[in-house]
């Protein structure tokens, strides 16, 4: 079974979940004992982290525009990553194209595909894109959609994306696995075509629907928390992510903050080589 995910963190967790003394098979059926790990090996995990909720999606996903956009997002000096880590992240822009080619090879060999997606914009867009991409290929496709929440005893745990799930937890969600019908695949493929035709700078989930929105759509969250009182950029972004978890990455808010600094709406009170370490306030 080939596992497809749309973010680096969740794909890394899935790789850890694969091949740990398999007890789980397709559609959540178990062979023996407790349901803990997902069968197979790490090489059966495909990461398509194209960030399709942002930017021009009329441009091909394997084109230079998408590569440059991904590098621009990953290439920010955010938390003081080591240089080799930053280089690895930038290289991901090229690796995603190779991952898509690898997926095509697996499908050509008759391997079934299981898509793990959520309602986070990057994941929903990735799922719609993939359904469109699969429309000209014969494939056995299953899906596992991340539920809004799960109850564990008297505790409710809410979820935003698969990146929040530990390697040992993935198998517990296989009860939600279902086959994707041809009609459903066509519906989602058409949804992607509509988004491409619209081609807004951003895509967001509004009232349950994936919708094209302007580039400044999430900026109100910055203005909601940024005041004339200086604050570390890391703290500001952390508060936005913590209090308003809309499935948007920290790098997007960092990019928008930088945009408003250049426009003179936000000022740098105390600069730093590491963007997230600098102190900022309203201009």
Residue ranges and their predicted role:
Residues 1-86:
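A structured, charge-rich N-terminal accessory region that forms the first stable segment of a protein
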Residues 24-28, 64-76, 154-179:
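Acidic, Ser/Thr-rich peripheral helices and adjacent loops at domain boundaries
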Residues 157-231, 235:
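A conserved mid-domain beta-alpha-beta active-site/ligand-binding segment of alpha/beta enzyme cores
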Residues 199-283:
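C-terminal, charge/polar-rich interaction regions
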Residues 28-52, 140-152, 252-254, 269-272:
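A generic structural motif
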Residues 129-143:
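A short alpha->loop->secondary-structure connector
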Residues 12-17, 57-58, 123-131, 153-157:
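A short acidic (Asp/Glu
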Residues 75-127:
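Long, hydrophobic/aromatic-enriched structural stretches that serve as scaffold segments
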């Amino acid at each position: 079974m080939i596992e497809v995910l749309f973010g680096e963190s969740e794909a890394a967790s899935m790789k850890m979940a694969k091949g740990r003394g398999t007890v789980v098979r397709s559609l959540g059926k178990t062979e023996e004992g407790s349901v803990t790990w997902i069968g197979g090996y790490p090489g059966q995990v495909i990461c398509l982290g194209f960030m399709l909720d942002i930017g021009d999606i009329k441009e091909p996903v394997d084109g230079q525009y998408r590569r440059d956009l991904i590098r621009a997002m990953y290439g920010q000096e955010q938390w003081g990553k080591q240089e080799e880590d930053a280089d690895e992240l930038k290289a991901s822009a090229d690796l995603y194209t190779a991952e898509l080619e690898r997926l095509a090879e697996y499908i050509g060999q008759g391997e079934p595909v299981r898509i793990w997606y959520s309602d986070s914009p990057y994941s929903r867009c990735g799922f719609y894109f993939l359904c469109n991409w699969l429309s000209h290929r014969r494939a056995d496709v299953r899906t596992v959609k991340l539920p809004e929440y799960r109850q564990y005893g008297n505790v409710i745990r809410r979820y935003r994306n698969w990146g929040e799930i530990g390697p040992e937890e993935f198998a517990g969600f296989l009860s939600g696995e279902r086959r994707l019908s041809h009609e459903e695949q066509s519906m989602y493929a058409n949804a992607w075509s509509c988004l491409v035709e619209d081609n807004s700078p951003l895509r967001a989930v509004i009232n349950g629907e994936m919708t094209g929105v302007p580039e400044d759509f999430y900026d109100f969250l910055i203005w909601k928390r940024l005041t004339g009182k200086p604050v570390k950029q890391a703290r500001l972004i952390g508060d936005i992510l913590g209090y308003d978890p809309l499935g948007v990455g920290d790098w997007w808010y960092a990019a928008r903050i930088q945009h408003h600094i250049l426009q003179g709406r936000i000022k740098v009170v105390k600069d730093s080589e590491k963007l997230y370490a600098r102190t900022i306030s309203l201009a």
